[in-house]
Amino acid sequence: LQGMAHPEHYLAVCCILKDEDPFLEEWFTYHRLIGVEHFFVYDNMSARPLDENPFIRKLIDAGGLTLNSIAGRAMQLPAYAHCLQNYGPRCKWLAFIDLDEFLCPLETDDLRRLLSEYEEFSCLALNWKCFGSSGFISRPSGLVLRNYQERFIKAHPLHFHVKSLVQPEKTANVNTAHAFFPCRGEKAVNEHFRPLPFGASLAPISWDRACVNHYLLKSQQDVERRIHRGRSDVLSSKPTVDYADFQRLLAEKQEKDTAALRFLPALEERLARGNSPDMITAEDAFPQPPDESELETYTRLSGLCAQDRRFSEAELLLCRASLRHAGRAELWTFRANLSRMQGRRGPALRFLRKALSLNEIPQCYEELLDLFIQGGHVSEGRAVLTFLLHASTVRTDDAGFNHKLAVAKELLARSSRGRESA
């Protein structure tokens, strides 16, 4: 999928579903809440076609959902392949999940902010976190997130499974429902930036930054419904979870897990408002600058947000900017600046490495100098300062820049004297 035009969406989701009406509003509304901008949905012969569902119709009419019909058994991989090929060019990131899976950011409330740190990779693979029945025989009223709060122990074998959020531009093809083949030279990583084997569907369990809450069982009634419905991923007479699996899993140790509950107040408020078309198009949208073609417009508005400590808005503006300007070192340098302002040294260094790989602009070294000074890394700061003083790319007639160097010299000298006296 090389050579695509600029994407429209920073984060979209692809899913295939059948007869999921009781869960649609919660699932789609939740994912809008955490930053998903568009849904590519494949209706696999639902008894009531999805385009007859009023909520789905509202999403379609608001421009938030693209609906396809797909007939036959084991159509998950064909649907994924169709989505990657036909809709991938419209997306920076595309997640492939099911209706019983909820993407769950743990460090931030908006998944796009996390994904911005992984833009140099083809795929971010997130581990499953599998939940049980919480003792329900019949399907309870209310939300899935509220009803099911007990998961299997962290070391459970199910949790080695991952689900993939891919960059279509860097992705060659579908491997399984869990994993994709990256393009030549590209890498899939887990949340700690550790590369995964080519096309891997399993990874060491890690739930530090994000995970996929998989509501595997729900109630016994739901298990029976899934057994009757059959599978969408493979041609098999055995369901994902059969009665024997259900009884075995019921007997396994479970632990309380409330990590996703922080989203409930906003989710319930939004559901109570009825998901009006106006809300779907306007709420959680990127702040739109007047000229989307100019990186400087984005960085200026992002800087204004950062001055007011509205860091989420500031970072989301740069996510929007990356749809057009991912090859500009200035974008990555500004991202590093935002991370440093929040005390997030790791992301700042990663952003600066990316910036330097694109173009060794002076601003990048200035930001690196500020980062080292702020962190008290005197020797590293002195090395960057020495480079700046002798680099031919630096304008020595820039009064503002020279003042900054003088301040940096003094700060480094103070830090050095402080260490010696200690």
Segments and roles (model prediction):
Residues 47-96:
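Active-site-proximal specificity loops/subdomain of glycosyltransferases
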Residues 292, 326, 359-360, 393-396:
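Short coil turns that delineate tetratricopeptide repeat
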Residues 296, 330, 363-364, 397-400:
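Start-of-helix register in tetratricopeptide repeats
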